[in-house]
Each structure stands twice: as structure tokens, then as C-alpha cells.
């Protein structure tokens, strides 16, 4: 089977049109990204990428921060493709003048060519210089009416792969007495539920034991709470996915992480696994096994 040809993505466009957002989105998709690369170094960069097994997807950002070199960008792209048989894609990010003016006013920054301090003059001069590059671009995205989330979604749609779009959930039980997990996105306190700790026959065991699990899950208070909690999660999770989140960590806590949190986490993992990939872990369980 022939080795898959590496591709080079060249990102350019108007200052303020979303290149910073694009960098973060591409990195999240597994791209090796170099920002502010002078066009004359494109050939050297590609040689490095092409000869390395560490990088399968690479992107460079070139804009007018390197104005003295930018005029050579189109020629450098053509030279690179002719001499090294590179399959490159040029992405041009654009936005209307009025939107760019508004964005610069919000950030209190100036475009790179606003030498006199006049925003519009700098934007229009930049647009004129970039026109040749825009004409040879493979993909042009106008970000004028796009939110950050919408721009990320467009980039994932065009440059992502199936693996990029995966979403998974980790359900974790823990004990508050040992600290809240710092990487949890959602923390649910179930210390208000009936506690098997006070049942002598159940105290030595954990929520992994069927007797403890049945005790916790059969209680009226648990059933009422769990139904509402699951409904809340099923409502919220699509929103997390829409925001581009790849992994959601749900932490369920009771006092020691032995009985109630383990039982709830077990049931939650079963129910969420009907729709999503789910991993489950019990942070404190080793404290109680083998006692």
C-alpha cells in the first residue's frame, strides 16, 4: 500500500479575521502549526515535515507581520509545489472592513499597516497587498458573521477527520474527604442520599457490591434524584458537543467515595453508554478493597 501523501496547509488572510482561532482549532485537530513563518522558509519547513515521521499534518500561518517577505508568498508557494511535489492548500480568512474595524476597536489594537493610526486606511492597504494571495487560495472563509464556535466548526468540517470528531465521557466516583477532582467538568454531590455506611451488613463493602448498589438505587430519594439528574445530562451533553468539547468528565461524589457515589456512577455509565462512548473510574476504590 502506498504511503499517504503528506499535506501542507497554508493559512493567511486579513489581520483580525480569525487566524488565532484557526491556529487553536488546527492544533486541536492534530496539526503541527507554525505561526508567523516567513514565506522564504516554506521550502525548509516542508523538507523538515516531509522527512519526519512525527508529523502527519502540518500548517503554517503567514501574514503581514512579515510584510517585507509577504510579497514573495505566492511565488514561494508555486516554487514549492513545482520543485518538491507538495500538495498544498491555501486557506484565506477574510472579513468585511466594517467588521474588522469593530473588532479592532473592541481589542484596542491597530492593524499592522495602520501607520497613521487610522484603522480603515490600514485595513484597506492590507487588503490590497493580500489580493494576489486571495486569488490563488483554495478555500476562502468570510468570518464576518461567524462566531468563534461557528468558525471552529467550519474548520473541523473542512480539515478534520472522523477521529477529530469523536466525543467521549468519563464518569468518575470520588470522596469529598479526599478532594474534588480538578479535571471534572460536572461535579454532583450525592451525600444527601441514604448512606449504606450506617447499615452494618453493608458498611464493609463498596458500590461495586450488588447488595450496596441495590440498596442505594432502590431508595425513593435516589430514584427521584437520578431521573432528574440523567435528564439534565441528556439535555446538556449535546450542547457540550456543539461547543467542540471532545471529552466530558462527570464526577459523582459522596463522603468517602465508597458506597453512594460508586453506585450512582455505575448506573450513570450504563445509561450514558447507550448514546456515547463512556469510561468509568472509581478514584477511591483501592482504599476499601481488601480491607
Swiss-Prot record:
Residue positions binding GTP: 63-66
Entries under Pfam families matching the protein: PapZ_C, RapZ-like_N
Name of the protein this chain belongs to: Nucleotide-binding protein LGAS_1315
Keywords: ATP-binding, GTP-binding, Nucleotide-binding
UniProt family annotation: Belongs to the RapZ-like family.
Species assigned in the record: Lactobacillus gasseri (strain ATCC 33323 / DSM 20243 / BCRC 14619 / CIP 102991 / JCM 1131 / KCTC 3163 / NCIMB 11718 / NCTC 13722 / AM63)
Residue numbers binding ATP: 13-20
GO molecular function, one term: ATP binding
SUPFAM superfamilies, per the entry: P-loop containing nucleoside triphosphate hydrolases
Lineage, top ranks: Bacteria, Bacillati, Bacillota, Bacilli, Lactobacillales
Function: Displays ATPase and GTPase activities.
Lineage top rank: taxon: Bacteria
